[in-house]
Amino acid sequence: MGAALELREVDSELVIKRFTSALPYYEKYAVAQHRIGERLADLLTATGRHHFEHVLEYGCGCGVYTRQLAQTVTVKQWTLNDLCPVCEEYIRVSPVSFYAGEAETMPHTDTYDLITSASAFQWFKDPESFIRTVAGLLRPDGIFLFNTFSPDNLPEIRTITNRGLHYPSTEALMKWLGAAFSAVYKHEEQIVLTFDSPRDVLMHLKRTGVTATPRHEEVWTRSRLARFDQAYRERFSTPDGQVTLTYTPLYFLAK
């Protein structure tokens, strides 16, 4: 089908709309995101740090990762951020302050000993500048822990629809992090989910907000959906008749 169209421009209004619609269903459908949160929590545990004075989490969503963190370490003060104002209703940790708005323009009155984010980094408009900002907000012993995804993320969707989000390369991320931090740890993996049908894949993406892409997307007509279903089954079926969807998370811990 040729090279996939990489979507570099992030439509913040559309992201808010799609993720707000997905929030009531997110915890049930976000299987990969649960695993990613567990991996991030494991990486934090491996540092030997069990308590943090002030934690900042970007892109907290409905709080899945926040709760995983709270079960892993003790935190004196939380600061949570999300683009969607309604996310404040899902907060279950305290004491906490919440900022609704763009992570990259968020005002700060304090520094942090842990800045973290799960599956939100790919939505940032200027990731290189954001990394520099984070480095400036960390205390001397602070940790920056986050994940994003490799350019190979969701290859099934990219192959069939010829569209996909733009993800910075691993090399670019390591370069940016290396310029801002003295030590950087990287880990990558594949998370392969299986579904009964391609339509279930689309429902999963909708219920987790992953469809928050620019407005010029084609409408899912009945004929287009049928073509998608057939092409997906032909290329990405398992021996038992299910279909796959592959996430390729990249994890980074920087000091």
UniProtKB/Swiss-Prot annotation:
Keywords annotated in UniProt: Biotin biosynthesis, Methyltransferase, S-adenosyl-L-methionine, Transferase
Record-linked CDD domains: AdoMet_MTases
GO terms for MF: carboxyl-O-methyltransferase activity; malonyl-CoA methyltransferase activity
Metabolic or biological pathway: Cofactor biosynthesis; biotin biosynthesis
Gene3D superfamilies: Vaccinia Virus protein VP39
Any one biological process term the GO annotation gives: methylation
Class of the enzyme per the UniProt entry, highest EC level: transferase
E.C. number: 2.1.1.197
Transmembrane portions of the chain: none
NCBIfam families linked to this entry: BioC
Biological function: Converts the free carboxyl group of a malonyl-thioester to its methyl ester by transfer of a methyl group from S-adenosyl-L-methionine (SAM). It allows to synthesize pimeloyl-ACP via the fatty acid synthetic pathway.
HAMAP family (alphabetical): BioC
UniProt similarity note: Belongs to the methyltransferase superfamily.
PANTHER family reported for this sequence: ARGININE-HYDROXYLASE NDUFAF5, MITOCHONDRIAL (PTHR13090:SF1)
Official protein name in the record: Malonyl-[acyl-carrier protein] O-methyltransferase
Native source species: Porphyromonas gingivalis (strain ATCC BAA-308 / W83)
